[in-house]
Structure formats: structure tokens, C-alpha cells
């Protein structure tokens, strides 16, 4: 809807400042998918499921603890086999959503973990244990017995376990005597050719409404020999499942994330981790064979061999320093991987999340230092499963990891102990003072006109998520003593929009929304993110092979014979590129622009879609985008040289008559771009 334009002078002629509507589709959201994994309480998990490993004798023989250790050291390994069992609710999904989940999302997520993890080979069938009415049970000859009777139905999450998957009901009387098999039950056929049974439902439960949760999962039964989770459940929230192509990878990553909570990455499983010899990392009670119970959390308490508290002294915050206590995962492979990743040999382990409450804290990696690792507590952009996460799964004692399945994690890589062990305020302040880059953090307050940047991997157009909060942040999360264009004394209101990252501001992908519906995203890879032609002022080209390039400091401009439009949203864009003749070539419209040296300003002047587009793109270092390709060819980027003369580049012109030139007006596109933390959830 057009507004009456005010007048302003421009040279010798009056030009119209026409606000061509505040476009609702330009509403910008920095997206965060929050996980609030609801770990099962100790009494909700069924223990003692009997399995037999392929190279062991009868599982019932001998001392179970000693037997486990011996098996652990010699066991053969095979790829993890996950059996999916659908609840009837899955079949009630809308056809498009069912096909997406059944044909793409679940198969890809399951296949990933089947290729990434190996387990000890088993033989025979798996029969799950029946649940008891009482939390008190007796264990006789390695079998779990209920008091007097078993529950009529055994649930795993929202799904009823089929009778065919269940063992007989074993009971004792209240004093632990007269132990027997309930004659009214029969053993089911059991589960063959599987190491983990995953029951899947699709119900719009109350948990689905918490933060627009997409899915949640947990384990429900553990085996007797090594305590490995052997059955679990996942619920998919129908109303939160998106079928948009540009959201598919995030949806798949969300389901992978949830599966991993059920397989081992859970606060309710840490106490059951074992070392390479199969010995428990956490001491066990003699009477139950289980770790001690944390009465407050209602989970089994791990030892310092798994998670240890570390005090960070002199943690820099606004106006001074505080002591910060962090929980560190300190298992051997995790320590080795985080030290190698950050290039910090004194790092004690991998920091766990300390915010978000029960379900987020301790059961995810710390967002501040492992931002887009998929097992942090919120997905904000390009989630990856790194070697650090695979190392944790291997350190559980239940799996061997195939590290070739890990995706490189660039966040924080090689940045040293100053990044991994100190506050983001320290990092920003130290590097600012020395004229160095403060990436991956940033200090540009989001304000109009909106100026975008590129993520460090150049995969997305992005924004600095530094915003003014409604209330002053807690002292421990105030990360600035001063900020450009912010009044003294108000710095405590400013911080990153992602609370789990300790409000440290960083460059983040975003989405354009219309009436809270995603129109397009900012990831360069997806063709669906291309702007409509009439909105493509910077001639961007999204799709496979596209990368993000910075614009110059000047706004892009569109001209016709009658009007000039300047877009007050600029800073970066997605473009295709080529690598040849030792040079990076950026493709804009139908033209190719050669980069002769880093920081070169490529002036663009191209007629397209009825407008003359004018702007500039900055050349990155050639090796960033072409180095690997040239190296594979036995070549390399050529040294910098003088750029070609301007007349070597295309410079389109308008063909206008004299009359039309005099009547030209200017329209400034002043779309109000609101950055807000719309929280999508996965749990």
C-alpha cells in the first residue's frame, strides 16, 4: 500500500521520497529451534533387558559384571541397526507430511546413525521387559521381577509396546519370595535383526505447544549387560512439521538430534557410561547394580570421571569480573577432540549448556563455544554433527564411531584457549583493541537501515543478532562496557538474541516472513530463497554452488527512465562463482567478474527486469573459495595483480529521452525490517 511521499531536494530537481509500502514479506526473523529434551526419570526407565552378544556364552551364566567386562574387550562390532515401529497416529498425518516423514526424514536420519555408530554384534531376538506398577522390583537370576503383577500395557513414550515385542511377566511377592513367571503371559516373537527399537508417534501433545516443538525423544529401556539403551520413542508434532524444501535439512537434523538423545546423549544416561574395558565410569550400588540416585533430579548421578565442575576465575563481564562455574564433559575422546578443535591443550573438556532449565542444561553442548554443533540446545543455522559429538557417543562405552560421518565444525576452530576458556566479552575486547577480527562474534547493533553480512563459511547472508532487550540482562551476560551509538549506562540492555549463547552476539542466518509464514531464508544453497525478480535489487542468485559475498558500504540502486530506487537493506548477497585461470570469478546476472586481489571492489551496472541495477561487490581472498578446487587440480590461486580496466567489465546504460530524464523521481524502499527471536522448538 503506497503512502503519500514527502519531498526532499536532490541536486537541481525535486525528487519524491516514496515509501512503496512497508512490505510484510520483508519481516526478518533470526530463527532458533529450541530443544527441551525431557529426560526420563529413573523410575520411568525399564532396566535389565536380556540380550546375547554374538561372541559370548549364555548371558545368564556367571557374574554379570565380570562377564560384561570380558565381552567388552573382545566383542565384534557391526553397524548399529535401528528398527522403526510406527504408532497408528503416524498414518493419520496429512499425506504430504506423511510422505515427507516416511520417505525422507526418518530414513535419512536413521541411516545417518546406522552408518555413524557401531555396536557389539548380537544374536537371537530382543524381548523387552514389561513395566511394573510399583517402582520397587526384584532382580533374580538376572531377570527383573514385578511385585505380584505387571502392568496391563507397557508404554514407551506415547506408544504402546506391542505384545509381540514383550517378554513374559515375571513376579515375586512383596517380600521377594515365590518368584515365578505369570502363567497368564507368553513371550512374544521378539525383535530380530535390530540393536535399537524406535517407537514413533505423531500426536499434537501438550509438549508440542512448548516453544513450537517439532519433535522430542528419549530412551525407555536399557539392556542388562552394559546398560545400553535398547528401546526409545520419538513423537513428531504434526502442526510444526514444515514441508518447505528450504527447511528440510533442518528438519532432518532435528530428528537426528532427537534420535541421539535416545541413543545416549542424555543427562539420564551419563551415569551408565562405561570405559573401553566395559567397566562403569560411575560406581554402582552393591544391592541394585545401579549408580546412586540424584533425588532432586530423579536421575542416576554420574561421577567426576564423566562430568566435572570447573571454576572459571576472572570471567570478564561489564564493569568487572565474576567467577563462572561450568560443567565439563571429561571423557577421554571428548577431551582429545575439543583440544584439537580449539587448539587448546589445557582445555579440561567439552563445556555443557548451563541454561535453559531441566531438559536443556547439561544435556547439550554449550552454545557460546559450539554454536552450530547440532547437539547444542537450539538450532540457529547450518547444524552439523561434529567429531566432538561422535567422541561422546564412543566414550559411552556402547558404540564405536565412524568419524568419516562427522561434518567439519568451523565455529571456534583453531581460535585457542582465549576463545574456549574465556568470556566473549574478553574475546571481543581483546581483538578490538588490536584491530583484529572479532568473528565469530560481532558488535553491530541491529537497527535500520539493516546491513547484512556473510557467515564465516560464506554459506548464508546473515545479521549480527545484537539487539536491545526489554530488560537489563543479568550481570553475567552483560558483554559490553561501551557500544557505538548506545548511550552510556544502557549497555546492559544490549546482547545477542540467543540466550543459550550467554547473549554473546554473533552473525546468524535469518528468514523473511509474511504473517509468521516463512517466505524464504538466507542460506545461499537453496533456489527457493531467490528473491522475486521485482525484489532482486542486487541481482542475487541462490542455488547449489552459490556463496555469500559482501557488498560495498554504499546502498544498491535501481534506475529506470522515470525513477530511482535505493534499497535500505543491503550489505551482502548470494551469487554463483567460478574458479579458473588461477582466479575467482563472481557471476552476476549474465556476466562474470574477475577478482584480481582480495578486497577489490567490483562495480556492477547491469540492466535487468526493466531496471538498471547499480552496486558493488567486494572480492574475498581467492583461496577461501577456490583453494581446494585448484589444489585438487595441482594448481593454486595466482598472486594479486592490477585489475582489468573498467571497460573490460559490462556497464549497461539507460536509453532515455530528454523529457523522461527530467521527470525522474526517487523512491527509497524503506521496508521496516524487524529482528525478533521467533522460537521454533525441537525437544
Swiss-Prot record:
It holds the Pfam family Peptidase_M8. This is Leishmanolysin-like peptidase. The lineage of its organism: Eukaryota, Metazoa, Ecdysozoa, Arthropoda, Hexapoda. Essential for the coordination of mitotic progression, and also plays a role in cell migration. Binds 1 zinc ion per subunit. Gene3D superfamilies: 3.10.170.20, Leishmanolysin , domain 2 (3.90.132.10), Leishmanolysin domain 3 (2.10.55.10). GO terms for biological process: brain development; cell adhesion; cell division; centrosome duplication; chromatin remodeling; electron transport chain; germ cell migration; gonad development. Its cofactor is Zn(2+). One of its GO terms (molecular function) is peptidase activity. Zn(2+) binds at residues 257, 261, 364. It comes from Drosophila melanogaster (Fruit fly). It comes from the Eukaryota. The gene is Invadolysin. The active site is at residue 258.
Amino acid at each position: 500500500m503506497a503512502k503519500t511521499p514527502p519531498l526532499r531536494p536532490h541536486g537541481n530537481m525535486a525528487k519524491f521520497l516514496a515509501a512503496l509500502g512497508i512490505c510484510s514479506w520483508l519481516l526478518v526473523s533470526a530463527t532458533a529451534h529450541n530443544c527441551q529434551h525431557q529426560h526420563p526419570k529413573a523410575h520411568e526407565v525399564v532396566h535389565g533387558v536380556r540380550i546375547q552378544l554374538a561372541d559370548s556364552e549364555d548371558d545368564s551364566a556367571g557374574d554379570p559384571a565380570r562377564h560384561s567386562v570380558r565381552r567388552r574387550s573382545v566383542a565384534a562390532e557391526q553397524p548399529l541397526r535401528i528398527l522403526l515401529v510406527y504408532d497408528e497416529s503416524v498414518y493419520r498425518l496429512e499425506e504430504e507430511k506423511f510422505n515427507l516423514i516416511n520417505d525422507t526424514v526418518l530414513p535419512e536420519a536413521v541411516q545417518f546413525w546406522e552408518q555413524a555408530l557401531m555396536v557389539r554384534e548380537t544374536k537371537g531376538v530382543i524381548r523387552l521387559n514389561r513395566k511394573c506398577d510399583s517402582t520397587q522390583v526384584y532382580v533374580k537370576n538376572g531377570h527383573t521381577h514385578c511385585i505380584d503383577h505387571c502392568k496391563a500395557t507397557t508404554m514407551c513414550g506415547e506408544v504402546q509396546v506391542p505384545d509381540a515385542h514383550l517378554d513374559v511377566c515375571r513376579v515375586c511377592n512383596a517380600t521377594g519370595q515365590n518368584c515365578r513367571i505369570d502363567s497368564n503371559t507368553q513371550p512374544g516373537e521378539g525383535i530380530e535383526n535390530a540393536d535399537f527399537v524406535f517407537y514413533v508417534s505423531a500426536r499434537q501433545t501438550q509438549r508440542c505447544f512448548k516453544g513450537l516443538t517439532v519433535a522430542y525423544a528419549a530412551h525407555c529401556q536399557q539392556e542388562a549387560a552394559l546398560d545400553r539403551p535398547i528401546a526409545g520413542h520419538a513423537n513428531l508434532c504434526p502442526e510444526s512439521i514444515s514441508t518447505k524444501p528450504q527447511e528440510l535439512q533442518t528438519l532432518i537434523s532435528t530428528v537426528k538430534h532427537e534420535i541421539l538423545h535416545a541413543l545416549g546423549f542424555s543427562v539420564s544416561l551419563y551415569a551408565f557410561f562405561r570405559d573401553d574395558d566395559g567397566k562403569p565410569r560411575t560406581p554402582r550400588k552393591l544391592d541394585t547394580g545401579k549408580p546412586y540416585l540424584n533425588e532432586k533430579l530423579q536421575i542416576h548421578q554420574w561421577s567426576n570421571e564423566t562430568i566435572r565442575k570447573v571454576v572459571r576465575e576472572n570471567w570478564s563481564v561489564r564493569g568487572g569480573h565474576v567467577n563462572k562455574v561450568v560443567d565439563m564433559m571429561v571423557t577421554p575422546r571428548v577431551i582429545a577432540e575439543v583440544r584439537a578443535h580449539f587448539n587448546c591443550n589445557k582445555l579440561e573438556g567439552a563445556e555443557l549448556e548451563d541454561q535453559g532449565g531441566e531438559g536443556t542444561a547439561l544435556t547439550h553442548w554449550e552454545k557460546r563455544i559450539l554454536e552450530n554443533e547440532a547437539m547444542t540446545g537450539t538450532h540457529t543455522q547450518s547444524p552439523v554433527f561434529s567429531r566432538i559429538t561422535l567422541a561422546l557417543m564412543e566414550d559411552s562405552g556402547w558404540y564405536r564411531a565412524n568419524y568419516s560421518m562427522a561434518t567439519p565444525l568451523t565455529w571456534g576452530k583453531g581460535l585457542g584457549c582465549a576463545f574456549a576458556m574465556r568470556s566473549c566479552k574478553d574475546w571481543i575486547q581483546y581483538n578490538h583493541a588490536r584491530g583484529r577480527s572479532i568473528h565469530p562474534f560481532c558488535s553491530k547493533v541491529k537497527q535500520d537501515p539493516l546491513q547484512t553480512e556473510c557467515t564465516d563459511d560464506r554459506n548464508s547472508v546473515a545479521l549480527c543478532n545484537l539487539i536491545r532487550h526489554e530488560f537489563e540482562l543479568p550481570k553475567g551476560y552483560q558483554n559490553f562496557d561501551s557500544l557505538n551509538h548506545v548511550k552510556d549506562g544502557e549497555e546492559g540492555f544490549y546482547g545477542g538474541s540467543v540466550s543459550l549463547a550467554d547473549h554473546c552476539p554473533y552473525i546468524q542466518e535469518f528468514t523473511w516472513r509474511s504473517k509468521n509464514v516463512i517466505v524464504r531464508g538466507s542460506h545461499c544453497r537453496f533456489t527457493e530463497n531467490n528473491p522475486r525478480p521485482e525484489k532482486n535489487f542486487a541481482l542475487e542468485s541462490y542455488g547449489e554452488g552459490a556463496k555469500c559475498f559482501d557488498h560495498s558500504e554504499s546502498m544498491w540502486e535501481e534506475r529506470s527512465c522515470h525513477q530511482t530506487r535505493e534499497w535500505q537493506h543491503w550489505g551482502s548477497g548470494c551469487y554463483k562463482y567460478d574458479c579458473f585461470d588461477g582466479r575467482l570469478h563472481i557471476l552476476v546476472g549474465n556476466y562474470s567478474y574477475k577478482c584480481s586481489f582480495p578486497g577489490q571492489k567490483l562495480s556492477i551496472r547491469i540492466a535487468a527486469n526493466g531496471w538498471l541495477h547499480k552496486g558493488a561487490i567486494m572480492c574475498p581472498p581467492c583461496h577461501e573459495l577456490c583453494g581446494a578446487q585448484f589444489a585438487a587440480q595441482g594448481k593454486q590461486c595466482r598472486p594479486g595483480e592490477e585489475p582489468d580496466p573498467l571497460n573490460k567489465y559490462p556497464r549497461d546504460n539507460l536509453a532515455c529521452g530528454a523529457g523522461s530524464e527530467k521527470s525522474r523521481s526517487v523512491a527509497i524502499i524503506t521496508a521496516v525490517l524487524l529482528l525478533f527471536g521467533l522460537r521454533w522448538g525441537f525437544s
